[in-house]
A protein has these predicted regions:
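Long, continuous compositionally biased terminal/linker segments
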Residues: 38-68
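A short acidic/glycine-rich loop-to-helix N-cap element
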Residues: 106-120
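Charge-rich, low-complexity N-terminal segments
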Residues: 1-45, 89
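Amphipathic alpha-helical hairpins
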Residues: 37, 92-93, 148
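Helix-rich interaction surfaces within compact, conserved domain-sized segments
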Residues: 119, 123-127
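A generic structural signal for beta-strand entry/edge sites
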Residues: 30-32, 49-53, 93-99
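Short, internal acidic amphipathic alpha-helical interface segments
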Residues: 57-101
Length: 148
């Protein structure tokens, strides 16, 4: 049996992985790196002593009258995808918000290839899930008029 030593996963290594995906990382002084895309912001937080967390908030909110449809969509998406997982919650104004989350499993460290692959998978899967939500719940305000 052989062993492989792997380095701890740090904010710098995650930042390099975001760059390797071809995105510009935005690094905060709170231990987070973000990839900011048109209408999408995907963050990875690296809290000291805790697993890294990938998070993204869907940029739209839903009226409470759509709660059953949202709950059904959340169940279907979570049942059909490994990552990220999506949850719904109620905002202070009563609207329904959707939150995407993934906990990275790098307890004993990871190789550069592993970090890059998992960061890439999370970013691409989060964008794909948000695109699915866009298809399931079209935004009537973004449609072009017939005379546009």
């Amino acid at each position: 049996m052989s062993t492989t030593d792997t380095l701890p996963v740090t904010l710098d290594r995650i930042t390099q992985a975001v760059e390797a995906v071809g995105l510009i990382p935005f690094v905060s002084n709170t231990g987070q790196v973000a990839a900011i895309l048109p209408n999408r912001t995907i963050r990875i937080a690296v809290p000291e002593g805790h697993p890294a967390q990938g998070v993204a908030d869907y940029p739209r909110f839903f009226d409470p009258s759509h709660a059953d449809q949202i709950a059904s969509a959340v169940r279907r998406l979570n049942a059909s995808t490994y990552l990220p997982k999506v949850t719904s919650g109620t905002t202070e104004t009563g609207a329904i918000a959707l939150h995407l989350q993934h906990t990275f499993n790098w307890v004993v460290g990871a190789t550069d290839d592993q970090v890059t692959a998992e960061v890439s998978q999370f970013i691409m899967a989060a964008v794909a899930m948000m695109n699915q939500l866009d298809i399931m719940f079209p935004d009537q305000w973004t449609k072009e008029g017939t005379n546009a």
